[in-house]
């Protein structure tokens, strides 16, 4: 056993204890209740964290030398770190994930951009996209995907990783989970953020044609993933939230179709247009795409409290995002128990020069009051945390407060 294997074997043993703890089954049951719109306390998840700022006592320091071994080591160390400091309601799965090698999977244009980093260690950077769409002929820049799978390569990768962890944890080749259906988030990368809103006034017909092409590209992805049997029915999460449910065949291994899985839709760039334009430019195009799936998570950072009536036109929506920019009380009144409120508490509270725990508590309590008064189930999803100002203890403090507030339900 070489040095890398010794490191991974020890980490796998530690993770196995976490993953086989009874609390994971309890959490699965809670997520199934929440996602089934049954009475349940608010559930908590924490994701998209600034890992480069969080190393405590060397817990996250990589020690393996082999490139593949370091990928496995990184995944195990992060899971163990989260289990130690802020587990929330995360289910720690009893296996190692190894995503299948899928080539040609893209959503239209090849990104051309300039980036600017405030912290060279942070992978969250500013993006300025070079416009590739100014006339109808430029629609050809929005390319259709051609998906390919290298099964022989995946077999070798699986064998290598299985050997690395000495068989202590099973290794699971995973397919496509929580399919992304966000034509506008992809399209803005081709148009450029500087030009985007001018198109609604200056080039509405071109914008509609671009949306139509992006929807066709998305449909092509769905068709190819279905044909090549790449959808994965077992989805632990959807857009940073628990995806466990009794309503989909999550143990299905073959012939998995869109109707067997979750998807998530979003139109963050349309957060500044009117609700009526949201229907015209978003709902009309993505409704036929989203309705092919078993369940839908809708929304991300855009405020949706005044668009619930339009989202209702999409069948199978189960969760609706309420971002920090949403009016949570108005959103809860419109949702009225028909969907899970997926509340995104403000990550800026952890990024300020100083941390105010009472500000965090008030925000979470306001969410829970609004949900309960309107007969809604809700989840508290801390995500998009680009910095904690190198104070990792803030995440543990946020976690403690969230657990206390959820316990008051």
Feature locations, PLM:
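Extracytoplasmic/secretory soluble proteins
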Residues: 2-21, 102-133
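Active-site loop segments of alpha/beta catalytic cores
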Residues: 1-49, 56-61, 65, 89-91, ...
